[in-house]
Amino acid sequence: MTVLIDQNISHLIVPQIAFLFDQLTHVKTLGWIDWNDHNIFMSAKKQQFDAVITLDEDFNKLLLQHGTPPKVIWLKTGNCSTARLTEIIIAHKDAILGFLSSQDFDCLELYG
């Protein structure tokens, strides 16, 4: 599974959770750091990312407008540290991996 991390999450999380995914990329790596959500979503779609991990509800709205790919993993945690986001993602790894392999759902909301 190829997963993109949105700009509202620090790029420092990548090495902490990379083991969970086949490919994990931060928007910073792609040079998309100052792009708006629509451009990020549509570029992720064009490049066939399986999912976007974000803190931003706009991605769910874009998903409803444009469909998958990518699916959306929406971290509804509010502002918290990169360490805390890492803990939340790892704690929910089974749900995330099940979601990514499922055809039934397009958005996974995670709470911390």
PLM features: residue spans?
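Residues at secondary-structure transition points
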Residues: 31-39, 57, 80-84
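Glycine-rich loop at the start of a catalytic domain that most often binds anionic cofactors/ligands
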Residues: 64-69
